[in-house]
Amino acid sequence: MTLVKQDSDGKKLRLSRRNFLKKSIGMGVGAAGAALLGYELPGVNSVANAAGIEQHDTMPMEISSDYKRYNQKNTVFMRAFSGDQIVQADFFKYVGKKTGEIPQEGGEGWGQLEYAMDDAAWSVEDDVNGYHAPGFANLGLYNWEGKVSPNAYKFQTPELASQAVKKAATFFGADLVGIAPYDDRWVYTDVITDPKTATLKPNVFPFEPTNVIVMAFEMNYESFQAAPALLEGASAGNIYSNMGVTAHKVATFLRRLGYRAIPCGNDTALSVPLGVHAGLGELSRIGILITPKYGPRVRLCKIFTNLPLAVDKPITFGVAEFCKTCRKCADACPSQAISHDKEPSFKTITVSTSGGVKKWALDAEKCLSQWAQVGTDCGICVKVCPYNKLDEWHHDFVKLGTRTPARPILRFFDDLFGYGKVSASDATKNFWNK
């Protein structure tokens, strides 16, 4: 996109998104760049932290001294399987629309072509892993059992072991890989492993893990622009299908080296704090992980292992500060499930809120209600997030590592250039016609 503005002599000035921002950065202030276009920018005096990536020795989140581990029975999906009337109707309405048993009324973007795409994308996850996606453990490719070599391979150093594991994980399909130390704070106290009985049992590992390998997978950008229509669901489903295959391969790799491995997707433990602990990204207003490279447009899986590994440090790159002033996801959320509060807090919204961490709490019940309306996992919040871009302007800030007052007004630029405003119908057409 190119902005066009006339100067005082009536001549047209053309400025691309990237050159516009680079001009602003070159002047040292976002306001200078905006002045080229004659705009006044709100919040320009609120200077954010450095835009570069900073490493930390401890978790960059405030955790309560009385933090209690989360029980999986409280996730909105497990509540539905357990018969919770508050969420069960919405859950089965969502499933019914997703499978086509309940007719869709969404119009373009919900046609047979898109249904076929969505079903195909989810096919490996659904046909091989069964009920894994809602959070059931030890199913399909995420099986906890596997032949372990009796001869443990000895790496010279934990650093070399981590290097080998990351190489294998990216070779097998992961886009990002980080390693966290085992921390039982993020592990569910109890789990439900049988979708038919929804029986709760203590979450016990068959060995003592020492580390967690966390992998992030990029979802397709073009199809995600169709959110909340079916191509967004296909983008997520394709990754769920690929994620199980990669997790299984990495677990097999570890077992053949003579070490134990438990591959997990949405089950067993909280993925987002593990992603933060492994240095993959920051916690956001949406409640999901934002990575420097792909923003929030990723899915996560993890593998618990007893292989000695060198761990990665948690990082920050300005997400928390930016989320305080942006609120674009909260404004766009049809069900208003995302907090509008400026500051994160320890308050909980529903029983599904994982407490004890200072954050913006998501209303999972309202979120599921939106899923029930559209018959997909929505994704509007990810679509509109200013960090959800291909290699474009927000990456310039990260790469340059410059101190600039522009970070608080990135949403202004994001809106100015029309990001996240493409309709589901138009995005669906664009996807098929490109």
Predicted stretch roles:
Residues 43-52:
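Ser/Thr/Pro/Gly-rich low-complexity linker/stalk segments immediately outside membranes or between
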Residues 139-150, 230-231:
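A short, surface-exposed helix-loop junction/capping segment
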Residues 389-413:
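C-terminal/domain-terminus segments
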Residues 16-39:
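N-terminal export leaders
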Residues 1-15, 19:
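N-terminal secretory signal peptides
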Residues 399, 411-434:
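Long, compositionally biased charged/polar accessory segments in the mid-to-C-terminal portions
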Residues 166-167, 172-387, 399-404:
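Catalytic cores of enzyme domains
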